[in-house]
Each structure stands twice: as C-alpha cells, then as structure tokens.
Amino acid sequence: MAALKASKKRKAVTRDVEEEAGVFSGDELSSKDLDGALSDNAHDLLSDEDASDSEIELIDDYSSSEEEDDEELDSDEIPSEGEDEGVVKKKSTAVLDLDGLEDREESTKEEEEEEQLNYRIEKDANGNDRYVYDEINPDDNSDYSDVDENSNTIGNIPLSFYDQYPHIGYDINGKKILRPAKGEALDALLDSIEIPKGWTGLTDPSTGKPLELSQDELELLRKVQMNEIPDEEYNPYEPLTEWFTTEKEIMPLSAAPEPKRRFVPSKHEAKRVMKIVKAIREGRILPFKPQTQEDEEDKDVIKYDLWADEAERPDHPMHVPAPKLPPPGYEESYHPPPEYLPDKKERKAWEDADPEDREREFLPQDFGSLRRVPGYENFVKEKFERCLDLYLAPRVRRSKLNIDPESLLPKLPSPEELKPFPTACAAVFRGHKGRVRSLAVDPTGIWLATGGDDGTVRVWELITGRQLWSVKLGEDEPVNVVRWRPGKDAVILAAAAGDDIFLAVPPIADPETEKASLDLLDAGWGYAASKPAPKPADEEKKSTPPQWIRPSAALADSGVCVVIPLRYIAKTISWHRRGDYFVTVCSGASTPASVAIAIHTVSKHLTQYPFRRRIKGGGPPQTAHFHPSKPILFVANQRTIRAYDLSRQLLVKIVQPGARWISSFDIHPTSATAAGGDNLIVGSYDRRLLWHDLELSQRPYKTLRYHRKAIRAVKFHPGGRYPLFADASDDGSLQIFHGNVTGDMLSNATIVPLKVLRGHKITGELGVLDIDWHPREAWCVSAGADGTCRLWM
C-alpha cells in the first residue's frame, strides 16, 4: 500500500522534464517501455501487484483525454486531489513522466520490506494453526504510547462492582490486579506527617493506591497557580502582523457603478411572496400553526423557576453609590442652536486661557449631520478623570427630605364654605350708546350712576334696573368717570367729562336730603367770594388753580350745580372718607406734572396742586386714592405707588409691584385698624393682579395671573363686612376672590379664587372697563365696552 501511495503521489506531478543522457540513449522507447508513464484514473485504482508489474504505454488519443478533462472541469464540481493525479495536459506534444520510473523502483523495494512476515504460525491444543503476531514497537511518528502493564483495563466501570472480590480489575495481559493492603491507623498517621512529593491525599479509583502527581503535573499546577502560560513553546509577545492594514490601498477594489438591481425591487421575490400569499389564502399554508400533541404534552410537564426563591443581596453598610453624570446640554449637541456657537472673540479668549481656567473643556461646534462628527479627542482623558474621581474622591451620603409637595401648600377652604359671593347675573342695564366707561353705587346701595362715550350720566335704580335721571354733559366728549360722595347725609355725584369736573345733585332723593346736598355745595360760593380775585396774568399760567364756576342754565335745570374747569382731561376721581375732599388725576402725556394731580375742597370751592414736579420714575401718574383712616395719599404712576403723608408733607413709602403698567389699585377698607397693617391690590395692563402687604414688604405678597388680557379695574368690598375683592379684564370676565386679613401679625392674608363671571361681549378689543360693590350686600356691578352694565348676585 505504501508503494501504491507513493506511486500515486508521484503521478500527481505534472511538469516539463528535460531530457537526460542517462535515461535516453538516443533511441525511441517502445510502447511497452512507456506503459504506465501516463496513466489514467482507472490505472491508479489497480492493486499493488498490478502497479508493480505495470508497463509503460504510449497514449495515442491524447486529444480525447483533453476533451474529457475539459468536460469534467466545466462542471460545477471542483476536482479532487485524487482526480487530478496522473492528468497531464500539453498543447502540442505529450510529455513523458520519467520520474515515475525512478519512483517505481523505490516502491518495489518498499513492497519487499512489507512482505516480510510479522507473525509466526503455531499449533494450538487441537492441532489447528494459530497466528501469533509480534509485539508492535511504536516509533516517534506513532499515536500509540507505552502501555503500563500494571494499569487497570476495566474501563469506565465503578469499582464498587469489585467490592466482594479480592481483586479490583485486570491488566493488559488479563491478569487480576489484587487489592492493595490497607495500612493501620499508625501508618496513615506517619504518611500524613511525612508527606512525599506529589502527595494528594486521594486514592486512584483504578488501582486503589494513593494518587501521586508526577513532576510534570506539579509543574503544570504551579504555572496555573502563578497565572503563567502552561505551554513553554507559546510566545505571547509575538510581533503583530497587520494582515489587512499593512498596505494602504488607494484605488478601490472595484470601481464599477452600482447595478440597477440594487435599487429596483426584485421581481423574483415578488413572485415568491405572491405564491406564499396565494397559498395562505387557499389554506395550504397556515400562518398560525396549531399546537401539536407534543406541545400539549409539554404543558403537563412541571417547570420550576430556578430564581424564584432568590433573595436580593443587600448592599454593604458602607456602600455609597457613585454620583451620576449631569445630562448633556445644548452646547454638547452636534448641531447646537446658533446662540451656543462661539464667535471669533470668544474662541480666541478660550484658546488663550489656561486649561484650568476654561469654563468647559470644549468649544461647541456645528457639524450639520451626525455622520460628520469626528472622534472626541478628550474622551479617554475625561473617562480616566471620571475613574479617578470614583476611585479617590470620598463620597458623602446626603439624605433627602421626602416631603409631599401638597403638604407645603396652604390649606385653602372650599369655596362653598366662603359664601355669599356673586355667582350669576341678576340684571342688565341698557341705555348708553357706545361704551360704558365708569359706574358707581351710592352709599345707600339704592342707586347706580353710569357714564359712557355718549357724554351722558345716567342714574338707575339698582334692584329694578329702571333709569331715574339722565343728563348730557358734552356733545363729543365722553364721560370718563363718575363717583358718589361718601356719606348718607347728602347725595352729590361727581363726574368728569372732557376738561371739566361736574358736581350734580340728582333729583332722586327725598326733599330733606336734596336740600342738604344743595346747601353743602352752595356754602362754598361765599368762601370763594371772600377770596381776592386772581390777576389776569396769573390766570394765564397753567399752574394757577382753576376757579369754580356755575353751570349753564340747561345744566342747572338738569341738576348740575358746580363746574370745575381743569383745562386737562381727568381720568380718575377718588373721594376722601369724610366727603369734603376728592382728588383727580389727569394722566395724559401732555399734562404738565404740576397740574396732573389736584385736590379739591367742596366746602371752600378750592382746588390745590400738591405736586409742583413730576414724580420720579415710572412715567406720568395714573390714579390716586386716600387712605381710609389716615391722612395719607397714595399716588400710582406706571410702575410704582408712592404714599405721602399730607399732614407732614413727607414721602412715607414706595411700593414696587413689579408691573409694567399699573392700571388701577385699591386699599383694603380695614387697613391699619383690625389688620394691623396696610393691604393693597394692584391691577396692571400686563394681566397681573398683585396683593401687597405693606407691613411685610414693598414687593408683592401674591401675584395672580388668571386673565388672558389686561386688567382694567380692581375693587375691595367697602366696609369690610365681606372679605371679597374683584377684578375686571379686557377678556370679558370678572374674577371674584376671597381675601381674608386678620389682626394676627404671625399670619398672612388668605387668598382663595371663588368665581369667574362671564357675560360681557368683547367690543373693539375691550371687555369690562369698571367694577363696583354694593355697600351692604355681596353684590357687584360691572360696566362693559358692549354698552351694558350688569348686576351680579
């Protein structure tokens, strides 16, 4: 067989052979001599005897063999090594395989050596022939190793099967291996004291003797224990061979354009999908395979969860979790907003600064798309510093207070517990043409006075909504404000229309009250007559106080008694609690600062200008009110509210609401009496309602933002009987609040939203323009830009 393999291996070599003198003598070889030099696959499969006796023959039909070989190679199968042996191709002439002759002689010698017998024939006890083979001596190339003659050959059988026998198995020759004798306890003690090298304390199950390790096994265990490489021939520090990156390829492997089939859906796949869809529709393919009997049987198998009873291991008492990294911001985005990108000046300042002084470790950049983002150069450094912080920096556990946010909010009472307050519209007052700019309820709570863009002042009966009196004060000028004189001893109505202030006594009261009202207004004429007449030069000055005059005959017949020419349009009127003084504010931008605020005395028919210069900061004045119990005048401009002591002529306090433009404010009626301090509410055109506690701070105590448009008017309930206040807004709604003020200095005011009242229509971007309360009931009246007034109960 060895000769056959050698001959086959030699025949696989196909190369051109040069002619040698020792092989050819110049004569041509006969076909008999060349038999076997060029053999096909059939000759390769001959036996050893045929191979040794084969002759050399010439291959006449070489072209046919080439065609057969070509046909075999044209197939999809790759010819094996055995099929390629002996196949010789030449375009012009056939080549003689002369090396085959030399190999043939060598194979003949090897076959003769193999023919030597490795056994002998002996006679057995019956006289028959018995073959006795010689022992095999393995060389270095053999896979067999020396077999220990005393080794146990019972295989993978437990030794407990031999417990009742005196032996424990058989050796390679079939002889019994006797059980080793066991030593006494003293011998075992001595063996444990004098431990030999390689002692393990275990028993070899195959021999029953103590198991001892060899020197090689001990060395292997030592290397494993020392974390060394067991194989001595292995080199862990071999030079790195970069198979794919050694040479940089500049040109692409293939520059062919992408074929169209890469972008067009495959028609063959579509056909296959349609076949599957058709099969599913016909029922030949079931998309949801029903459960088989085996699956149903698996349900009966009891399955156990290995981790069902696993208990979570508690953390170490000293364990402190690592703090989390802060989340990334907009500046770390690959496409940050433009305001986060630095300009040239900021970039240069960052580059010139020391790394320790820089605010951040990088500059925000805009890459446009994520695929253009390069590697971050400080990534490894930041991770290393993070590891150092986790490893070296001490950690502190800070316990957080688990406080319910709802518990921090004040306990507000339910609105149902705070009744009465207005909830619905009870009456609608119609009669004005255009917007109703102002309204006021008289101190008795019986009559309602209104003024509008049509220049008329109307008095209504509050309960029934019936109009009782009306007077037209101007043709083209609207009535900006109407206010009743406080007190029940007289019925005097002040109205501002155009540049004049009108004081009227409507004929609606009883004769005694009406006569007392007329006498109160007529008493000032005598005081005015006793004063010296002003000079013509002084009358031309703008800062000269105006002289009170009598109205025209038509107005006098209508009930108007006094006219005060201010020369500027007055926007607000506010009476003093005693009814002898009232203050007017001309908030126009063209009004001089010296005449913007005027205080009028009814008993003397006297007008005074307390401010000679404009109030600092905040623009022109907007409105003014007297304190309900102190000689203090509050004046509000666009941004601040100032409190002046009229008796001492000093600035007492400056209130800073923080609003952009103050529209109105009101003072709590019980300020400085039961409450122990002054409380204000301020409305602004920037949709904010602010509550001020002047004893607490100059800043707002509460800021309420419930309206969608500007707030036009705010008002406390007069008298302090009901802790209510309301505001009116251009969004067409009124909001009613509960505002309780106590005399306890340790408690603050309680503010509770109660009701939102809607009914006025928004006309010309204007909604509710004014609001007032009934003096005794929890009723309020509102004036709207839609030309109506509404009574809310």
From Swiss-Prot:
Region feature (Disordered): 1-150, 312-349
Record's keyword annotation contains Repeat: yes
Acidic residues bias: start-end ranges: 47-85, 99-116, 136-149
Single Gene Ontology BP annotation: maturation of 5.8S rRNA from tricistronic rRNA transcript (SSU-rRNA, 5.8S rRNA, LSU-rRNA)
GO molecular function list: ribonucleoprotein complex binding
Ranges annotated as biased composition (Pro residues): 323-340
Main location: nucleus
SUPFAM superfamilies: WD40 repeat-like
UniProt biased composition (Basic residues): 1-12
A GO CC term assigned to this protein in UniProt: nucleoplasm
Record carries keyword Electron transport: no
Subcellular localization, as worded in the UniProt entry: Nucleus, Nucleolus; Nucleus, Nucleoplasm
Each WD repeat, start to end: 431-470, 474-519, 616-654, 657-702, 706-747, 763-793
Primary role: Component of the NOP7 complex, which is required for maturation of the 25S and 5.8S ribosomal RNAs and formation of the 60S ribosome.
Subunit structure: Component of the NOP7 complex, composed of erb1, nop7 and ytm1. The complex is held together by erb1, which interacts with nop7 via its N-terminal domain and with ytm1 via a high-affinity interaction between the seven-bladed beta-propeller domains of the 2 proteins. The NOP7 complex associates with the 66S pre-ribosome.
Family stated for the protein in its record: Belongs to the WD repeat BOP1/ERB1 family.
Protein name, as recorded: Ribosome biogenesis protein erb1
Source lineage: Eukaryota, Fungi, Dikarya, Ascomycota, Pezizomycotina
Underlying gene: erb1
